[in-house]
């Protein structure tokens, strides 16, 4: 039985569910879950939690992500990416803007911004996914959402051809960010229709492309009984949370028994969640959270016996 986090390279054409389904067949275990959906046409890093690591999948999902995207100015689509039907076209020429104009414009997207999610997305409105409305040719008001763009920058020269302009950007962002919406919004700021023509996720939850394995590589390693060496411990998925190492055996026992504590037994500055780690084994003991009605106390959220 495997336990740990496995960074998978999701190839284009597969859904995130396809990856999980195939892994369950390869590894012969059902206890597998991914940490955030990647659209079928998007390639890149998809961290997958296996065995007891499935208990930390939400925390991996909350950690930052990084993407490289191709932005195409001059044509918009129904899906905001290259898979959709054309909505609008407007010729773009090199006299319209240059590298410096794009660089200045991208600065405006840094920080917390508002996005309207695409109609072809899994965001729910009134209990129904937006893409279900879109497929039925129904219109519905889409709620604005705040997302965090930690960094964004151009990583290629502008390429003007056939009345369009193409360039690549790198984006570091929080969860819930739609890069294709970012591409269309860049076009709006320039005064042109636009779409995202290609997307690769280069980092997710602290895992990068070079650490990621294809399904074929995973199958080979499993057959060679050497896959466990490629798995990251579940503790890796909690590195985004503050932690305290516990030495006292009596306190360790109380933690593993799920007892409540006063903050002042550890740190009065605990604001939200805290991870307790065994000082001897470096293994996580539990995740605690501030008590919802007693701010001076912390209570267990997840205990790892």
From Swiss-Prot:
It is an enzyme of class 5 (isomerase). InterPro entries: PsdUridine_synth_cat_dom_sf (IPR020103), PsdUridine_synth_N (IPR002501), tRNA_psdUridine_synth_TruB (IPR014780), TruB_C (IPR032819). One of its GO terms (biological process) is mRNA pseudouridine synthesis. Keywords: Isomerase, tRNA processing. One of its GO terms (molecular function) is RNA binding. Its EC number is 5.4.99.25. Pfam families: TruB_C_2 (PF16198), TruB_N (PF01509). The active site is at 39 (nucleophile). It comes from the Bacteria. It catalyses: uridine(55) in tRNA = pseudouridine(55) in tRNA. NCBIfam families: TruB. Responsible for synthesis of pseudouridine from uracil-55 in the psi GC loop of transfer RNAs. Belongs to the pseudouridine synthase TruB family. Type 1 subfamily. This is tRNA pseudouridine synthase B.
């Amino acid at each position: 039985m495997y336990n740990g986090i496995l960074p998978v390279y999701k190839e284009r054409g597969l859904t995130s569910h396809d990856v999980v389904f195939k892994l369950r067949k390869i590894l012969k275990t059902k206890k597998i879950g991914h940490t955030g959906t990647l659209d079928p046409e998007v390639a890149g890093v998809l961290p997958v939690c296996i065995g007891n690591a499935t208990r930390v999948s939400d925390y991996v999902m909350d950690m930052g992500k990084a993407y490289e995207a191709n932005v195409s100015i001059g044509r918009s689509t129904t899906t905001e990416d290259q898979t959709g039907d054309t909505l609008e076209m407007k010729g773009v020429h090199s006299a319209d803007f240059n590298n410096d104009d794009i660089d200045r414009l991208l600065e405006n997207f840094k920080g917390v911004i508002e996005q309207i999610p695409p109609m072809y997305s899994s965001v729910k409105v009134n209990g129904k996914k937006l893409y279900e409305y879109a497929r039925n040719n129904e219109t519905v008001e889409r709620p604005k959402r705040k997302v965090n763009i930690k960094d964004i920058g151009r990583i290629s020269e502008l390429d003007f051809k056939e009345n369009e302009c193409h360039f690549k950007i790198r984006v570091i962002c929080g969860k819930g960010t739609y890069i294709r919406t970012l591409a269309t919004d860049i076009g709006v700021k320039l005064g042109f229709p636009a779409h995202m023509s290609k997307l690769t996720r280069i980092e997710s939850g602290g895992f990068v492309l070079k650490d990621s394995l294809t399904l074929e590589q995973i199958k080979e390693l499993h057959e060679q009984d050497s896959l466990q060496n490629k798995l990251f411990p579940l503790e890796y998925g909690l590195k985004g949370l503050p932690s305290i190492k516990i030495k006292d055996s009596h306190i360790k026992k109380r933690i593993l028994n799920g007892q409540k504590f006063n903050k002042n037994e550890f740190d009065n500055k605990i604001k939200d969640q805290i991870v307790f780690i065994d000082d001897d084994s470096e293994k996580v003991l539990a995740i605690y959270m501030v008590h919802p009605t007693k701010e001076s106390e912390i209570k267990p959220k997840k205990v790892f016996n």
